[in-house]
Amino acid sequence: MSWARTHLRSALSLAAVSARGATTEGAARRWLSAWPAPQEPGMEYQDAVRMLNTLQTNASYLEQVKRQRSDPQAQLEAMEVYLARSGLQVEDLNQLNIIHVTGTKGKGSTCAFTERILRSYGLKTGFFSSPHLVQVRERIRINGKPISPELFTKHFWRLYHQLEEFKDDSHVAMPAYFRFLTLMAFHVFLQEKVDLAVVEVGIGGAYDCTNIIRKPVVCGVSSLGMDHTSLLGDTVEKIAWQKGGIFKPGVPAFTVLQPEGPLAVLRDRAQQTSCPLYLCPPLEALEDGGLPLTLGLEGEHQRSNAALALQLAHCWLEQQDHQDIRELKVSRPSMRWQLPLAPVFHPTSHMRHGLRDTEWPGRTQVLRRGPLTWYLDGAHTTSSVQACVRWYCQSLQRSKHPSGGPEVYVLLFNSTGDRDSAALLKLLQPCQFDYAVFCPNLTEVSSTENADQQNFTVTLDQVLLRCLQHQQHWSCLSEKQASPDFLSSPSPEPGRPGSLQPALRPPHSTGTNSLVFSCISHALQWISQGRDPIFQAPSPPRSLLSHPTASSGASILREAGAIHVLVTGSLHLVGGVLKLLEPSLSQ
């Protein structure tokens, strides 16, 4: 048995025991013994992912985090040590011509737009993003495609062995999950000789492990809001300070229109860093007098992300003295805001095609499968859920209404971490769902599930308790909505976030019923009632709480002319749903 295989078994045994207090060592061994042996000469992809997952519970890393909490700068210093142990220096990253992007809402979509625009120029692109939806290799892309399982496996073990070989008494820990993937992305991009790399910040900016990048070509900040407050601060201004930490001396940076307070913080951070910061004009300004721009991603909020992406791509091409940009006519708007406005220009044909052809699964995505329509959006902050509700309601109003049978509206929701799920659910309440379904971000309740979907940082009891809390919040909101005071209050303004025309409610609805399931698979089986070809033979409903809704709702769903399902609250939840609805994504 190879060293790697032996080390993998030992690490996973420890991870299984430490992550699940009720799991015995014998059970962990039985779980491990069920794995198929890897094909020689190398380790298989799933083995690499299982080993990567052990870094989620790396005990020495957790101890390191406790020590570094009062000194966040030490986190960046530790990342530089890991980079050196892996065989790279910080200066090596300058070869990647990086576009570094942070933000609270839309940073992933902005990166996707930017990468697709530049790829349309024939450039070889690298793209590092998080989290993944179905497979962890989605986080590292070359020319828009996730790296192959073979390439992932090769680079994973090469990096793992390198870090093991060059550890010493003072640096014995392996980097944790996200740090390891960040290092791996840098190695992949350098070895694949990309022309540029689009790098999405993980959390925050100032102390994020991607911020060892010292000389990006350009930086971007998407819309700001409240998220990860325990790490970044409890006000938008504090969060803006963290996000502005990616600014570098002399490196152009762009942001979209923000509230006055956080915009002032970004301006001050830029001035302190000697970073030229520009405010993006709205997309309409770039369309003025020209053809309307078509976006590959749905939702009005994507226009802000597209405007930022155009400026990032334009600046990158300008810095590289690209022929297409030298001939582009631009105008410099007068200063009307706290910041100078970025140039206005008519997008080139390559830019237009890039915006039109952008794909970013799990964000304002619609899947139609027979009578079921799935609306997938990984919104997980108050501002992004507001945008999700607007998109969902607009999509419903454009949808065709069936001639036979009522329409049924279902919410599938989960929220994790320190996010205020009650606040998120309150924003979803006006959509007037018939059923609210809650489940953890687990595709199956089984220890043999795909390694890409495993999370060792929480226990099953913890995630189920969280779902029951979601259900309790929803029930309280439903009771309040049904109260005479609520019914007599003014209706939401048409077109406002959360506004849904009463005519869209099915005639049989008298209120929202809620259910909790132990995994995504059981939730989808109940919602689809065998009417989706993937779930033609559903097992009996497995609601955690006995509820007449399970049986009465099943008959209504079976007879419905159309079933509209909004899946939101967590990108991990959306990823699990996509994994089950589109099995090809796991191949």
From Swiss-Prot:
Region ranges (Disordered): 484-508
Q: Which SUPFAM superfamilies match?
A: MurD-like peptide ligases, catalytic domain, MurD-like peptide ligases, peptide-binding domain
Described function: Catalyzes conversion of folates to polyglutamate derivatives allowing concentration of folate compounds in the cell and the intracellular retention of these cofactors, which are important substrates for most of the folate-dependent enzymes that are involved in one-carbon transfer reactions involved in purine, pyrimidine and amino acid synthesis.
Cellular component GO terms held in the UniProt record: cytosol; mitochondrial inner membrane; mitochondrial matrix
Q: Which UniProt keywords apply?
A: ATP-binding, Cytoplasm, Ligase, Magnesium, Membrane, Metal-binding, Mitochondrion, Mitochondrion inner membrane, Nucleotide-binding, One-carbon metabolism, Phosphoprotein, Transit peptide
For this entry, the protein name equals Folylpolyglutamate synthase, mitochondrial
Residues recorded as binding Mg(2+) 1, renumbered to this chain, are S130, E200
The record's comment on cofactor binding reads: A monovalent cation.
Q: Where is the transit peptide?
A: 1-42
Q: Which family does it belong to?
A: Belongs to the folylpolyglutamate synthase family.
Q: How does this chain assemble?
A: Monomer.
Q: Which Gene3D superfamilies match?
A: Mur ligase, C-terminal domain, Mur-like, catalytic domain
Q: Quote the PANTHER family the UniProt record gives.
A: FOLYLPOLYGLUTAMATE SYNTHASE, MITOCHONDRIAL (PTHR11136:SF5), FOLYLPOLYGLUTAMATE SYNTHASE-RELATED (PTHR11136)
The EC designation for this entry is 6.3.2.17
**NCBIfam families in the record:** folC
Q: List required co-factors.
A: a monovalent cation
InterPro entries in alphabetical order = Folylpolyglutamate_synth, Folylpolyglutamate_synth_CS, Folylpolyglutamate_synth_euk, Mur-like_cat_sf, Mur_ligase_C_dom_sf
Instruction: Write the lineage as a comma-separated list.
Output: Eukaryota, Metazoa, Chordata, Craniata, Vertebrata
Q: Which residues carry this modification: Phosphoserine?
A: S539
Q: Provide the residue positions that the database annotates as binding Mg(2+) 2.
A: H228
The gene for this chain is FPGS
GO terms classed as biological process: one-carbon metabolic process
Sequence positions that bind ATP: G106, K107, G108, S109, R363, D377
Any one Gene Ontology molecular-function term assigned to this protein's record: tetrahydrofolylpolyglutamate synthase activity
